[in-house]
């Protein structure tokens, strides 16, 4: 909810999803309290079943969640010129885990995007990239 509200406060329309009803309720309350609820839609969604339906997005932010099965859908959902900001647990500097990105995984998985910045280490991986084309 924090990133969604931050983006909404800058005039963007946002859709936030989380598997937790508590997290979604907290995000709605934060958006209401900060006066941006009109720019926000929050839904309880289990991403294990895939991305929810919706139009192309100018920005996708995915924090602390990694499911390789969603990579193609994320790329397809981005509009031309759209930005992807993704962070995940990583095996680089940490041990293996079901939801941990392998070394170089984010770079490889999103190779068709234009990479702006990214890093991995200390158990974290992140990537900022844009989809080729213009909005």
Predicted segment positions?
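Conserved SAM-binding loop of SAM-dependent methyltransferases across substrates and taxa
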Residues: 1-12
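Conserved SAM-binding motif I beta-strand of class I
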Residues: 13-18
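Conserved SAM/SAH-binding beta-strand->alpha-helix loop
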Residues: 20-22
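Conserved SAM-binding loop
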Residues: 27-28
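Conserved SAM-binding strand-loop segment of SAM-dependent methyltransferases
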Residues: 35-48
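A short acidic, Gly/Pro-enriched loop at the edge of an enzyme's catalytic core
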Residues: 48-59
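A short, conserved alpha-helix within the catalytic core of class I
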Residues: 65-78
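Conserved beta-strand signature within the Rossmann-like core of class I S-adenosyl-L-methionine
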Residues: 81-94
């Amino acid at each position: 909810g924090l990133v969604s509200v931050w983006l909404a406060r800058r005039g963007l329309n946002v859709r936030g999803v989380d598997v937790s009803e508590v997290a979604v309720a907290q995000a709605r309350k934060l958006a209401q309290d900060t006066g941006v609820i009109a720019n926000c839609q929050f839904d309880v969604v289990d991403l294990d079943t895939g991305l929810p339906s919706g139009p192309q997005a100018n920005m996708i932010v995915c924090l602390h969640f990694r499911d390789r099965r969603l990579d193609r859908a994320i790329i397809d959902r981005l509009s031309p010129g759209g930005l992807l900001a993704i962070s995940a647990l990583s095996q680089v500097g940490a041990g293996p885990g079901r939801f941990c990105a392998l070394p170089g995984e984010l770079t490889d998985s999103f190779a068709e995007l234009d990479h702006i910045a990214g890093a991995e280490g200390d158990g974290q991986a992140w990537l900022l990239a844009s989809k080729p084309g213009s909005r």
